[in-house]
A protein has these predicted regions:
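Glycine-/small-residue-enriched transmembrane alpha-helix faces in small-molecule transporters
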Residues: 1-37, 144-169
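Membrane-interface interhelical linkers
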Residues: 1-18, 47-73, 122, 172-174, ...
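Hydrophobic alpha-helical transmembrane segments of multi-pass membrane transport proteins
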Residues: 18-22, 26, 72-87, 155-166, ...
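Membrane-interface helix termini and inter-helical loops of multi-pass transporters
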Residues: 25-35, 90-93, 136-148, 195-211, ...
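Structural signature of hydrophobic alpha-helical transmembrane segments
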Residues: 34-46, 87-104, 146-159, 204-218, ...
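C-terminal transmembrane-helix exit sites in multi-pass transporters
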Residues: 87, 104-126, 246-265
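Helix-helix packing/entry segments at the starts of transmembrane helices
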Residues: 97-103, 170, 174-186, 222-253
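Hydrophobic transmembrane alpha-helices of multi-pass small-molecule transport proteins
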Residues: 123-139, 263-282
């Protein structure tokens, strides 16, 4: 029986969800290990894998002069956004951190409209407004220090929006493997001195969680995402990326005995239903 490209795309998107879910679990399971140390190991694995893939493909890592600032910008925004996302995962429930992180498509749309002059229709504007409403429910704005992790989580989504917008601009100009290579390289270079300033020697279990739980799982998530969009267009498979909100809620309850509060549930419901609404709208536009 022939398996359709869409089915393959959905399969790889769900593999990506599993990878990033396992990564989130590992991040929370290592409270003793500083954030920068976790980010270093996460990107070390991606750097080694991307370098190996480029070597196997005999691909040059040279980037055209006019694209260098954009590759650097993508790497820088991606790195800072990742640090912010790890901080959010450490200090919020997995579900809340991933709800905020999944707002990045909203900021991609806004950035693409401003910088790439892409057109946004009325239904997309409605979707953006609904998503921003969801932010209020998840963050629950106040003057308390307790709101800081939520704001950092939102900041990670904004930076991811910048990063993905640059990736969209570089499409056809720079291969995705080269983007991943330089993003991972910059992250490793930036986190190494910060990690050494406050290095915590991991025990055997923590080494396993850093390399496999965070590094390999994140690579699984990243490559799953890449393959998903290789087999099927974003309009057909992107919606399945939001399954991570549900898997995160389950893992929060099963492993950490925590559940998001009512306001976060409402925010998550708005995010998922708006994502479905935009998915159906975008799919209709492409048909």
């Amino acid at each position: 029986m022939m398996i359709s490209d869409k089915t393959k795309g959905v399969f790889w998107m769900l593999i990506s969800v599993l990878g990033f879910t396992f990564m989130g679990i590992a991040v929370k399971y290592l409270p003793r290990i500083p954030t920068y140390e976790k980010v270093f190991f996460r990107n070390s694995v991606s750097f080694i894998l991307s370098a190996y893939i480029l070597y196997r493909q005999k691909e040059s890592i040279k980037v055209a002069k006019e694209n260098i600032p954009f590759v650097f910008g993508r790497s820088f925004f991606g790195f800072v956004g990742m640090v912010a996302n790890f901080y959010a995962l450490e200090n919020l429930t997995m579900a809340e951190a991933n709800m905020l992180n999944k707002l990045s498509p909203v900021f991609v749309t806004i950035c693409a409209c401003i910088f790439l002059k892409e057109k946004v229709d009325k239904k997309q504007v409605i979707g953006i407004v609904l998503m921003l409403m969801a932010v209020v429910f998840v963050i629950k704005p106040s003057f308390s220090p307790e709101v800081i992790p939520s704001l950092v989580g939102l900041f990670s989504a904004i930076l991811a929006g910048f990063s993905y917008t640059i990736i969209r601009y570089l499409h056809g100009k720079v291969k995705s493997e080269i983007n991943v290579f330089y993003f991972s390289l910059l992250s490793v270079i930036c986190t190494f001195p910060l990690m050494m300033m406050n290095f915590v020697k991991p025990n055997l279990f923590e080494v396993f969680m850093l390399i496999v739980g965070i590094g390999v799982s994140a690579a699984m998530g990243q490559f799953g995402l890449t393959y998903a969009y290789t087999f099927a267009p974003a309009s057909e498979v992107s919606i399945y990326n939001y399954v991570i909100i549900i898997t995160s809620m389950l893992m929060d309850y099963i492993l950490f005995s925590t559940i998001p509060d009512l306001f976060s549930f409402i925010g998550g419901f708005i995010i998922i239903t708006t994502a479905i609404y935009l998915y159906l709208h975008n799919k209709k536009k492409t048909e």
